[in-house]
UniProtKB/Swiss-Prot annotation:
Residues 257-269 are periplasmic. It comes from Salmonella typhimurium (strain LT2 / SGSC1412 / ATCC 700720). SUPFAM superfamilies: Nucleotide-diphospho-sugar transferases (SSF53448). GO terms for biological process: 4-amino-4-deoxy-alpha-L-arabinopyranosyl undecaprenyl phosphate biosynthetic process; lipid A biosynthetic process; lipopolysaccharide biosynthetic process; response to antibiotic. The lineage of its organism: Bacteria, Pseudomonadati, Pseudomonadota, Gammaproteobacteria, Enterobacterales. This is Undecaprenyl-phosphate 4-deoxy-4-formamido-L-arabinose transferase.
Length: 327
């Protein structure tokens, strides 16, 4: 039995994208929650290429007296999970907590995650209670959660909630992974020895709109399927086998009917033959597209380009410095 190391410092990683309205309240509430921990702490804000004044507000917060805020500025938008990975590469805590900037997951839940992690868990996930999202978002989330559970075999209730806690060894291991498409909650669970979930409150979004549109949710679902499991390829092989057997059986049936009923019947069955042909062609194109997606991801991973470009990091009471990039 392995004993978990004591938690001496907590790092809170928050990706920010056009959240200027919620940032002041986010910083205030997160700071208050961290001060109640009785441990050392830091807050890392990662600007994911915001077009509003989010970056300026972050820099100002880092430069205040007695600030515990580190601001990381990416040169453009790379996506939520890439921004979080950028934050992971700068943390110094023993326990790292991720939190969205929209305040739908209350920062006041942070002490509960820390207390649960203190029980020896490597990963502490959360399940949103009484979700305040639209029916579309709730339905899409249920489909994605079910899809993840079926394809990865990792049974957790709410993969879409980013309010989560990870011990430092899990973070260090994830940073050594170089996949271009990364879904952090699943990747962490792959390496976790002990994982659990706790229920948390969920509030309505007070400022701005959700950054996940319908198309982004569709792309997220497709990314999850193709970057985390080879199950679709296995299903494709199974589907191909079924179609091949069905096609062979249908061919035998058509030959028998042709011999039994004569050429008159064969002429009248032309449209059915076309329908069967188009079905097979459609299945082939679907298979080719899926294989192409996997090959494209392999190509991107082989090139090993950095996930993001860190333009600037602002530490409390320090001078900003520039980094070239980070994988």
């Amino acid at each position: 039995m392995f004993d978990a190391a004591p938690i001496k410092k907590v790092s809170v990683v928050i990706p920010v994208y056009n959240e200027q309205e919620s940032l002041p309240e986010l910083i205030r509430r997160t700071t208050t929650a961290c001060e109640s921990l009785g441990k050392a702490w830091e807050i890392l804000l990662i600007d994911d290429g915001s077009s509003d004044s989010s970056a300026e507000l972050m820099v100002k917060a880092s430069q205040e007296a007695d600030s515990h805020i580190i601001s990381i500025l990416l040169n453009r938008n790379y996506g939520q999970h890439a921004a979080i990975m950028a934050g992971f590469s700068h943390v110094s805590g023993d326990l790292i907590i991720t939190l969205d900037a929209d305040l739908q997951n209350p920062p006041e839940e942070i002490p509960r995650l820390v207390a649960k992690a203190d029980e020896g868990f490597d990963v502490v996930g959360t399940v949103r209670q009484n979700r305040q999202d639209s029916l579309f978002r709730k339905s899409a989330s249920k489909i994605i959660n079910l899809l993840i559970q079926r394809t990865t075999g990792k049974a957790m209730g709410d993969y879409g909630c980013m309010l989560r806690a990870y011990r430092r060894p899990i973070i260090d291991t994830m940073l050594r992974c170089h996949e271009r498409s990364t879904f952090i909650p699943i990747l962490a669970n792959i390496f976790a020895r002990r994982a659990t979930e706790i229920p948390v409150h969920h509030a309505e979004r007070e400022f701005g709109d959700s950054k996940y549109s319908f198309m982004r949710l569709i792309n997220l679902m497709y990314d999850l399927v193709t970057c985390l499991t080879t199950t679709p390829l296995r299903l494709l092989s199974l589907l191909g086998s079924v179609i091949a057997i069905g096609g062979f059986s249908l061919s035998v049936l058509l030959i028998v009917l042709r011999l039994a009923l004569g050429p008159q019947w064969a002429a009248e069955g032309v449209f059915m033959l076309f329908a069967v042909l188009f079905t097979f062609i459609g299945a082939q194109f679907i298979g080719m597209g899926l294989l192409g997606e996997y090959i494209g991801r392999i190509y991107n991973d082989v090139r090993a380009r950095p996930r993001y470009f860190v333009q600037q990091v602002i530490y409390p009471e320090s001078t900003p410095f520039t980094e070239e990039s980070h994988q």
